[in-house]
Amino acid sequence: MATEGLAGALATVLGGKGLLVQSCDSEPAGKPLFPVRLRKNVCYVVLAVFLNEQDEVLMIQEAKRECRGTWYLPAGRMEPGETIVEAMQREVKEEAGLLCEPVTLLSVEERGASWIRFVFLARPTGGVLKTSKDADSESLQAGWYPRVSLPTPLRAHDVLHLVELGAKFCQQAMHPLILPQELPCSVVCQRLVTTFTTVQSVWVLVGTVGTPHLPITACGFTPMEQRGGIKVAILRLLQECLTLHSLAVETKGLLGLQHLGRDHVDGVCLNVLVTVAFRNPGIQDEPPKIRGENYFWWKVLEEDLQKLLLYRLQESSVIPLSR
């Protein structure tokens, strides 16, 4: 990929869009990569936050035996063959009775590659709110409740943070409206936009194997990788080309993600914004030295692209990625 191609790829990723995953630049040691499968080695969960003009939150009352009678946000596991958005819409219809459309991804949570939760801000488009007369195995009922006075008992208190995240986004968007892109991927992986900045310039790490490209690192499923989370795969790739003990590495968040659950292809690719800086900066006008020949630092010269990238970095204009 020439410089024009790299600029186009970076613009695509910064715009929340996706790119085909051709291969991975870094893979876990040992066993070869194998395609991931829902219900076998990965679990994806969807959750929706709804806030109306009265500052009320859509809550559902759980019917499951282990948490029956408690309250939570509409949520559930993805099924094979679904897109992420389809799964969210199905869960909302089953648990709350409403039809809906996504507004944006609010956050992505992970416990390693085997468990990922996609949190949406959504709006209702139709349907009939589920009442206690409609109780079934999916939920007992649904209702709108003041954000400052949610029904109790809550199934789990993590909803409080997610509701506040949604309210904050409604008041002032922290990042562009971003939705999952429907592009297939066979593994759980991350496309890295790894940056190094000085007062005047910004560089992006590029993979050289094949056509120059934004590098991709595959996530592993060993106990150590599950404990460390998907950041382990980021550090693995960077360790292959940089001397990390002298550097500070920060995962800023997500620029977007892609998935297409068709033909038994259940992988997901997260586009992740990462910063690299010297621990003892002093006056550093050049990025850290690359080891080997599989990567290089690309200096972004396109003014519009440089401004956009610096804005996303300085304002942390990304989807939160948390554990």
From Swiss-Prot:
Keywords: Hydrolase, Magnesium, Manganese, Metal-binding, Nucleotide metabolism. A motif (Nudix box) lies at residues 76-97. Its cofactor is Mn(2+); Mg(2+). Mg(2+) binds at L58. SUPFAM superfamilies: Nudix (SSF55811). It is an enzyme of class 3 (hydrolase). It catalyses: 8-oxo-dGDP + H2O = 8-oxo-dGMP + phosphate + H(+); 8-oxo-dADP + H2O = 8-oxo-dAMP + phosphate + H(+); 2-oxo-dADP + H2O = 2-oxo-dAMP + phosphate + H(+); 8-oxo-GDP + H2O = 8-oxo-GMP + phosphate + H(+). GO terms for biological process: dADP catabolic process; dGDP catabolic process; GDP catabolic process. Pfam families: NUDIX (PF00293). Residues 37-167 form the Nudix hydrolase domain. It comes from the Eukaryota. The keyword Hydrolase applies. Its EC number is 3.6.1.58. GO terms for molecular function: 8-hydroxy-dADP phosphatase activity; 8-oxo-dGDP phosphatase activity; 8-oxo-GDP phosphatase activity; metal ion binding. Gene3D superfamilies: Nucleoside Triphosphate Pyrophosphohydrolase. Belongs to the Nudix hydrolase family. PANTHER family: 8-OXO-DGDP PHOSPHATASE NUDT18 (PTHR22769:SF56), MUTT/NUDIX HYDROLASE (PTHR22769). Mediates the hydrolysis of oxidized nucleoside diphosphate derivatives. Hydrolyzes 8-oxo-7,8-dihydroguanine (8-oxo-Gua)-containing deoxyribo- and ribonucleoside diphosphates to the monophosphates. Hydrolyzes 8-oxo-dGDP and 8-oxo-GDP with the same efficiencies. Also hydrolyzes 8-OH-dADP and 2-OH-dADP. Exhibited no or minimal hydrolysis activity against 8-oxo-dGTP, 8-oxo-GTP, dGTP, GTP, dGDP and GDP. Probably removes oxidized guanine nucleotides from both the DNA and RNA precursor pools. This is 8-oxo-dGDP phosphatase NUDT18.
